Amino acid sequence: MTGWFLKDENYQLGAMLGYQETRFSWGATGGHYSYNNGNITGDFPRGQKVIGYQQKFSAPYLGLAGKYIYRDFDIIAQFKYSPWAEGKDTDQHYLRDITFKEKVINQKYYSAVINVGYNITPQARVFTEMSWSRTSNDVGDSTYYDNAEGEVEKMKDSAGMQNYNYTIGAGIQYRF
């Protein structure tokens, strides 16, 4: 949600309030392993599920938004900040049948977006955009699940989590 406090034909400046959630996940199948400084090595069969990992970051945020127009060109920028971000992850080790879950609260979240475009017509616009986000590295709690034995162990202040990411894109926008 954006409230514009400066608005002119060629520029706008406003304050933002919102909520953002970002998720990442990946898995490892097959491959080679090396533990204990190379003393224990081996191979997993191709296609065998080994590890699955998921991260979720959520944050209510405050921010600034701006737009500047020069003839058919425009530049749009946003900056978001939150001291209340929360990170969660799940680390699944399939072969050992164990799961680690971590939760970190009160992380700092920063995000910046810049979008540069050219208006081909009043409805059509081509643009390029870059966004960058950072969630600070902070300490949180971890829970260990031995799924085969049914054991659960909770460990306070034993997990650390952070995230940096960026995207670069280009597109065509059509307004109805």
Please tell me what each predicted stretch does.
Residues 57-60, 68:
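Short, surface-exposed binding/anchoring microloops in extracellular/periplasmic proteins
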Residues 1, 21-57, 82-113, 135-171:
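Extracellular/periplasm-exposed beta-strand and loop segments of Gram-negative cell-envelope proteins
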Residues 10, 72-75, 122-128:
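Repeated loop/turn-to-beta-strand initiation elements of outer-membrane beta-barrel proteins
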Residues 15-23, 30, 66, 77-83, ...:
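Transmembrane beta-barrel strands of outer-membrane/channel proteins
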Residues 2-6, 19, 66-70, 116-120, ...:
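Residue-level signature of outer-membrane beta-barrel architecture
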Residues 1-25:
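Internal, hydrophobic cores of structured domains that mediate oligomerization or house catalytic pockets
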